[in-house]
Structure formats: C-alpha cells, structure tokens
Amino acid sequence: MTKIKIVVIVGPTAVGKTALGISLAKAFNGEIISGDSQQVYRQLDIGTAKATQEEQEAAVHHLIDIREVTESYSAYDFVQDAQKAISDIVSRGKLPIIVGGTGLYLQSLLEGYHLGGQVNQEAVKAYRNELEQLDDHDLYERLQVNNITIEQVNRRRAIRALELAQFADELENAETAYEPLIIGLNDDRQVIYDRINQRVDRMLENGLLEEAKWLYEHYPTVQASRGIGYKELFPYFVGEMTLAEASDQLKQNTRRFAKRQLTWFRNRMAVSFTAITAPDYPQVVHDRVRDFLGQKEKS
C-alpha cells in the first residue's frame, strides 16, 4: 500500500509552529490541519492562540472552529476529522501539513489509534460504553489493575488510557495509512520561556481577559474552559487574585505545559528538534521537506 505523505510540525507552545506551517504551505502547495485540542472551539480565539484571520487567508486551515464551546472533543474525534481532512487535501493534489501541540492527538493519528485497519470499531464503542457506566472508584481500580498511571487524573483521560491498553495488540498491528515527516521545533529553555511570557502579555493586550470572562460567565464548567489560558483568569473574576497574580499564574502554567509537551514528543514520538534561533533554521526545514517529497530545489 502506498502511504500518504504528510508533514507534521510539533513543539512547545509559542515556539512558532503556525508561522512555519504557513511558510511550508506556501512553498509546497500545502494546507494546514490544526492538531490542537482547543482550537476546534468557536469563539475561543485569543486564549487558544488560534491562527489569525490574516494567517488563515495566507494558507487554508482545517479543524479550526468546528465545535461549540459546549461540546466535548477527544482524540477519537480528532482522528476521524483529521483523516477526512487529509483525504480531502490529497484529493486536490495538495500536501497535508499538521500543526499542533496536542501530543496524544498526533500520536493517535500517526499510530492508528482507534481507526487502524484491524481495530474492531464496534468492540471499541462497546468497551467505551462499559467504562462510562463505571463510577470513579471502579474506573480508577481498572487503571490500577492494568498498571496504568496517567499524568492528570480525570474520567476522560482514564477511559482513553484503558481503551489504549485494551486494544494494544490490534493497535500494534494496525497499518497506518500515512508516511509522516515529523519536524520538531525547540530552543534553549529560556528562549521558549521568554516567548511564552511575551505571548501571554500580547494575549492580554489583545482581549484575552474579555474572552475568558465571557467563557466564565456563560460556560465555566465545560471542557473548553479547562484549557490553559482561561481557567487561570477565573480567580481574578471573583476577587481571589489580582490581575498581575493571575497573569503570572497563566505564564507559569503555560511554561509547565510546554515542558510536558516536550517530554511527550521526545518519549512517545521520538522527535528530533531543530533550534528556532539557528541561523539556517528556515532553510534546513525547507530542505528536509523538499527531500521528503523528492523534489528538486528551484533555481
């Protein structure tokens, strides 16, 4: 089976994935698929660092603004949506470029999670329904029985981890349809932390506070409100923190998130990284993509 070539750009938040994705889309006749769990939500633009209108006009973007904030979204949903987007892009003779920092989503797509050729979908659904009927105590007992630990304990993550364990053999044998070129972006820790701090300041200047307040007043308990960029500001709205304290908390949580992202990509996806401050960084990446596609450099 001839596999579909796709480019995947990963790295910590604020590293510059969107800009690189647009650059590659222009150079290689590509379209971008967002691989971010929060950018699917309509009306949440600033806190999710969604591509701006100008950026979306510079390159076609998929899987942005496809859910209401009241809806849930999972790795399973992403794999289904991403597969459809990839098929659509390829059918028009273009290159799919996935840009995102949600490691589980990307790994699920690239390794055939749920949708691999040999995974029985009815069995997956039946097992998920069984897990959803369990109370929290029984669900976490299942985790212990299967020797599963998850970084952040909640029902959604617990069920997903148990599904992966239950169908591990099928997933290992499932044939993925894609041949990915994974491009990792990173730099010295202080460079990334400075970029994060500057981004948070820009977000606040551009209206993040108003966006977060709207979410807090209308939908404070939905899945979308638990994303970094919103929940840190909620204490400010009820007088438990000053704005400066909430801003510092947001920066700190984002830095911690960036560290977790890097750990995931290194351990789960074996990504090698390119430093964004290297003088030849853009050219090196473009050359890698050109070689991957078997193209010659234009004279």
UniProtKB/Swiss-Prot annotation:
Keywords (A to Z) from UniProt: ATP-binding, Magnesium, Nucleotide-binding, Transferase, tRNA processing
Obligatory cofactor(s): Mg(2+)
Residues that coordinate or bind substrate: T13, A14, V15, G16, K17, T18
Catalytic activity: adenosine(37) in tRNA + dimethylallyl diphosphate = N(6)-dimethylallyladenosine(37) in tRNA + diphosphate
GO molecular function annotation: ATP binding; tRNA dimethylallyltransferase activity
Gene3D superfamilies assigned: P-loop containing nucleotide triphosphate hydrolases
Pfam families documented for this protein: IPPT
Binding-site residues for ATP, renumbered to this chain: G11, P12, T13, A14, V15, G16, K17, T18
Marked site: Interaction with substrate tRNA: T102, R128
Top EC group: transferase
Gene Ontology biological-process entries: tRNA modification
InterPro entries for this protein: Dimethylallyltransferase, IPT, P-loop_NTPase
Superkingdom of origin: Bacteria
Annotated EC: 2.5.1.75
Entry's family note: Belongs to the IPP transferase family.
UniProt xrefs under HAMAP family: IPP_trans
Function: Catalyzes the transfer of a dimethylallyl group onto the adenine at position 37 in tRNAs that read codons beginning with uridine, leading to the formation of N6-(dimethylallyl)adenosine (i(6)A).
Alphabetical list of PANTHER family matching this protein: TRNA DIMETHYLALLYLTRANSFERASE
Record note on quaternary structure: Monomer.
NCBIfam families per record: miaA
Protein's name in the database: tRNA dimethylallyltransferase
Organism of provenance: Streptococcus pyogenes serotype M49 (strain NZ131)
Lineage: Bacteria, Bacillati, Bacillota, Bacilli, Lactobacillales
